[in-house]
Amino acid sequence: MGNDKQDLLKISKELVSIAASKATVNVPGVNQEKGVKITHGKEGFIIDVYVIADFGVKIPQLAWDIQNSVKEAVTAAANVAVMTVNIHVQGVMMPREGSI
């Protein structure tokens, strides 16, 4: 019985990861999604999202938009509680020369 619970948690983590990744790349201003880390806490999932932002984007607004998008997508796809969505902006993609 304990193994079934672990298998279910593994499936849930995979589903949460996929939903979070898809939600992240659909947010305007995200140049690249670098990864998602899922941790299961006592009251729900803790999701860490790593991104590269587009040049000129307001980082606080981008983080807010990603958080909302991820929470909505994960809740809809997996019907699980999301405790926290942490956004880690790992860089900014500069525009190509001549494209400004």
Protein language model regions, located:
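C-terminal structural segments of small proteins and small subunits
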Residues: E72-P95
